Amino acid sequence: MKTRKIFAALMLSMLASMPTMAQEKYFSPATSEAATPDAEGFIRRWTVLEPISKQNRSNTVFVDSYLRETFAHEYFKNQMTILPKDGQKVKVTFERPKPQPRPAGQPGQPGGAPMDFRRMQQGPVEMETATETLKWHKLDSKHYNFKLMRFGEHEIQRVYGVIYWVVTVINCDQDMNDVRLSVGSNSASQWWVNGEDVLLMSSDRRMVADDCTSHRLNLKKGENIIRGAIINGPGMSDFCVRLVDENGKVIKSGYTIK
């Protein structure tokens, strides 16, 4: 009997540690020291907000007009200007399916539980407004692409029907003219540099490095802010970002990441 209890305790301990072990495979906490682009020029340090629930039964809705309207909606205060700190919390407003009454004795999911895609596919679903508190995490990715799905499943067990907000600050040694932001994302996304809308990546897409590039940008000496929003319904979520020069050559030096 004692042996069984010890075995059960060990199993519970192993199961509890699995999410942390999985997280450590993909990310490490950012340090106070400035980071640099990796050997291929990818920016790996990002401050990421825990995923906001955004119910979509399919990614086919990710056309330009839908994305602009969705990303323009204010989910939290100072959405387009905030420079979040690690661990900072924000109050988020979002929509979720309104819980349906169930027959007495029939188990059901509580309000705010993960999206039921079968229910969504049956037709229009009545939505309700809800609020929750989410937290920012400053992380260094261990891969060139930041695996948002792994981040989401570890932090709040939310992986589908989501919007991720990401921010990073790069510090340029000198003015950098005629550079482009080069991005890959799964699925659709929108990107801003120093508050300017520079790139919209629409449609249901897979993450491919350098999938889209912005117009030519002039980065000033000192701090420059890169902000992104990535949306997905069903499926994996990740992204990668680097800078290229006017000839498409990857920029691997000349700036650090705060």
Each PLM stretch: what is its role?
Residues 18-22:
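Sec/Tat signal peptide C-region and signal peptidase I cleavage site
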Residues 177-192, 226:
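Aromatic-lined ligand-binding clefts that engage carbohydrates, nucleic acids, or primary amines
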Residues 154-164, 202-207:
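Extracellular beta-rich ligand/substrate-recognition surface
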Residues 8-17:
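Bacterial N-terminal signal peptides
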Residues 23-145, 229-258:
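Accessory carbohydrate-binding/adhesion or oligomerization-edge regions at the termini
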Residues 193-241:
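Beta-strand-rich ligand-recognition modules
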Residues 166-178, 216-221:
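Extracellular and analogous surface-interaction loops
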Residues 1-8:
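Bacterial N-terminal signal peptides that target proteins for export
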